[in-house]
Amino acid sequence: MPASSLDELVALCKRRGFIFQSSEIYGGLQGVYDYGPLGVELKNNLKQAWWRRNVYERDDMEGLDASVLTHRLVLHYSGHEATFADPMVDNRITKKRYRLDHLLKEQPEEVLKRLYRAMEVEEGNLHALVQAMMQAPERAGGAMTAAGVLDPASGEPGDWTPPRYFNMMFKTYVGPVEDEAALAYLRPETAQGIFVNFKNVLDATSRKLPFGIAQIGKAFRNEITPRNFIFRVREFEQMEIEYFVRPGEDEYWHRYWVEERLKWWQEMGLSRENLVPYEQPPEELAHYAKATVDILYRFPHGLEELEGIANRTDFDLGSHTKDQEALGITARVLRNEHSTQRLAYRDPETGKWFVPYVIEPSAGVDRGVLALLAEAFTREELPNGEERIVLKLKPQLAPIKVAVIPLVKNRPEITEYAKRLKARLLALGLGRVLYEDTGNIGKAYRRHDEVGTPFAVTVDYDTIGQSKDGTTRLKDTVTVRDRDTMEQIRLHVDELEGFLRERLKW
């Protein structure tokens, strides 16, 4: 049975060292989390699986690691400086601040009906309601108060301010002088670093269309109301691909990447019934998108976006390129007066220059971790009436691949053998192997069930040739316990390597 609530997952993550509140000893920093010993392993395993699939296993992909600090002009011409904002509203009574669309989603149906009527918007179209409210903020604030919009913190109707936009980018300054010339930003997405490096990568690799550039990295958004644990946070990590194609082939490649990403998430252990493709209607599309399909996941807190696959057309390269007019670029935020490079592709057959279209699969690493934990969390009743919690993670993603456990910790022959075996298994390169000498084998099994360790290897008296029957026939054999079935088998240590490699290698 899965986790019944997000609180249950949060408690497990803290108790077992997956994820902690950042700066907790000083009251915590809202919307910021630290990954603990097991969390960092799970997160890295997910990222490595993504990189292996999309970079190493493909012949049409290159990698990139662009800087977090971003030149102001990059985000000026991308449109972020002017438009990367969320609608915000305050309750004068509680002094609480909320993102408007999130606040409205939590309202009772009768409250929303009154608000739709007050703003003269067709019922059921929340996107249109938010747009209407932002176009008439004074009227909207009064309508919210009159309609009895509830404050989630108090559960009572609020006295609401007119909504306004809040830019979510974190500003900083490069160098010792904090003036306009030194202004820079912490990147709000990893994508822009790929776009401005398009020509660099193209020149360095001599790639031909279609090809992609992949990147994993941190991004920062000053979210108005971070919530739902690591789902919506202010510092997060993205796994993004910008896949460059010829105009006219974009719709094919968009469909291709939607199917490819759905397939990959299932291979990582997410069930198909919990993955819901959602094609955004025209009124929900971002200003740069021709089409977007979101892969939604049934998180403990509800159905929410795990990954988005957008057809961004020529908007991005067209916004950052020089010679926009000569290249026939119309889908741009501003006339670019600063770019020094032509971000275009020369057709090797016709010699004609054009700006490629871009398909962007963009996934949240933190959301992926949360989805994997939610999917894997299982509570089972055992035949003896006891209950166990087990994380049924895909073995290759598990933070600890193998636990090597001496049956007793007061026999040097057994503990030293276990340590040597741990080193031998670690040399296989399959991931983290943990030596643990707690002295209570039953508790060790339960602990490793709870953190998702797929195999526990026990070194005992038989292993060192001191069987109870006085024989040495089981010398150099160990007990291997399976996490999911709890079944135990006896293997010679020389067989153990092949056994584990077969089950843990990608």
From Swiss-Prot:
Residues engaged in binding substrate: 99, 189, 236-240, 360-364
One term of GO molecular function: glycine-tRNA ligase activity
This enzyme's EC code(s): 6.1.1.14
Subcellular location: Cytoplasm
Domain of life: Bacteria
BP term (GO), one: glycyl-tRNA aminoacylation
Disulphide bonds in the chain: none
Record: residues binding ATP: 221-223, 231-236, 305-306, 364-367
InterPro entries recorded: aa-tRNA-synt_IIb, aa-tRNA-synth_II, aa-tRNA-synth_II/BPL/LPL, Anticodon-bd, Anticodon-bd_dom_sf, Gly-tRNA_synthase/POLG2, Gly_tRNA_ligase_bac, GlyRS-like_core
A GO cellular-component term linked to this record: cytoplasm
Recorded catalytic activity of this chain's protein: tRNA(Gly) + glycine + ATP = glycyl-tRNA(Gly) + AMP + diphosphate
Keywords: Aminoacyl-tRNA synthetase, ATP-binding, Cytoplasm, Ligase, Nucleotide-binding, Protein biosynthesis
Quaternary assembly: Homodimer.
Family assignment from sequence similarity: Belongs to the class-II aminoacyl-tRNA synthetase family.
Function: Catalyzes the attachment of glycine to tRNA(Gly).
Name assigned to this protein: Glycine--tRNA ligase
Species assigned in the record: Thermus thermophilus (strain ATCC BAA-163 / DSM 7039 / HB27)
